[in-house]
Amino acid sequence: MFPGKVNPRMLKKMQKMMKDFGMETEDLDVRKVIFVFDDEEWVFEEPKVQVMDILGVKTYSITGKPKKIKKEKVEEEEEVKVEITEEDVELVAKQCNVSKEEARKALEECNGDIAEAILKLEEEKEEN
């Protein structure tokens, strides 16, 4: 709670005084803290986190060294592979009267969005 070395008796006295003034502190068992900015993220692995309650207003203190990650890398990590089910493929193929291969390709291009895949195939039909 307090930086440097503090005499244990003095620490108890300080904590009592803080409590008398309506201030309470608590160490939190936190494994990771992430700050998300527009262009980067700061990831604190195993930080020391304390919450201080002063007359009902909570203030959080985070101590540790952040790992800074640029946003391009973060977005790549968040990219998720969409699962396309056989039922979705059959539905799109039947609705648009196309082969399952064409339906699957359209679903993949539309990230699994059935309605968007159907509209895409219908537009392609109109163009031909």
Swiss-Prot record:
Keywords: Protein transport, RNA-binding, Transport
Keyword flag Zinc: no
Quaternary structure (record): Homodimer. Interacts with the ribosome. Binds ribosomal RNA.
Source superkingdom: Archaea
Domain named NAC-A/B: residues: 8-75
Gene: nac
Protein name per its UniProtKB record: Nascent polypeptide-associated complex protein
Family: Belongs to the NAC-alpha family.
Ranges annotated as spanning the membrane: none
Function: Contacts the emerging nascent chain on the ribosome.
Molecular-function annotations in GO: RNA binding
GO BP annotations listed: negative regulation of apoptotic process; protein stabilization; protein transport
The keyword Cell inner membrane is annotated on this UniProt entry: no
